Amino acid sequence: MSHSQSGIYPFQTAALSRKGIAGIVAIEPGACPEPTADMTPYAGLPILVLWGDYVDEFPRWAPRLKNCRAFVAAANAAGAKAEMLVLPEIGIKGNSHMLMQDDNSLDIADLLIDWIGKHVATAE
């Protein structure tokens, strides 16, 4: 799980080796891999890219959201199990970039726990 500027690191790590990586949860990542990059490392990997509100109000973040959408599409085309979740698009509004500190942070945590439980296999 990563947030903001550390958002790219799980993707870079998975591209080097999938050992020990059961899934990736990136919360408002500062970057996603370029959609033209090699997507084979992500084949079969559960990936959630989560975004809150207000992205369009910040010129530096709107292109990052757009790039992450393109990455999710490219990763899925290569066999990943990637999902883009933009909270306002599912009716959850009012979240800042620091979702873990917002008033509904426990609801967001429950959402993440539920997604992980449904999509990420546990180690035996």
Positions of PLM-derived features:
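Gly/Ala-rich beta-loop-alpha elbow adjacent to hydrolase catalytic centers
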Residues: 1-6, 10
